[in-house]
Amino acid sequence: MKLTCVLIIAVLFLTASQLITADYSRDKQEYGAERLRDAMGKFKGSRSCGHSGAGCYTRPCCPGLHCSGGHAGGLCV
């Protein structure tokens, strides 16, 4: 009986803390889409030019590098 009461109180406490936290953070992400877009720009796959050793089939090599092996499967060197 005591264990059941302790479990019920623990569940009520955790539920209340989740509801309080959810209500507090509701308006905190006003510019979430902008932050996501800025973070996506930092990924390796979204760079505008191919760095040394990168493939040059889908994007051009960065300045100072050239495509070795042709555009059908070459690498930026």
Swiss-Prot record:
Which terms are listed as keywords in the entry?
Disulfide bond, Knottin, Neurotoxin, Secreted, Signal, Toxin
Q: What organism is the protein native to? A: Conus lividus (Livid cone)
The Swiss-Prot or TrEMBL record describes its family as follows: Belongs to the conotoxin O1 superfamily.
Which ranges are cleaved off as propeptide?
23-47
Is this entry keyworded Translocase?
no
- Which compartments is it annotated to reside in? Secreted
Fill in the domain comment.
Answer: The presence of a 'disulfide through disulfide knot' structurally defines this protein as a knottin. The cysteine framework is VI/VII (C-C-CC-C-C).
Tissue distribution: Expressed by the venom duct.
GO MF = ion channel inhibitor activity; toxin activity
- What's a GO cellular component annotated to this UniProt protein? extracellular region
Q: Which InterPro entries match?
A: Conotoxin (IPR004214)
Question: In the record, which residues are listed under signal peptide?
Answer: 1-22
Statement: the UniProt record of this protein carries the keyword Methyltransferase: no
Q: What's the protein called, per UniProt?
A: Conotoxin LiC42
Report the record's disulfide bonds.
C49-C62, C56-C67, C61-C76
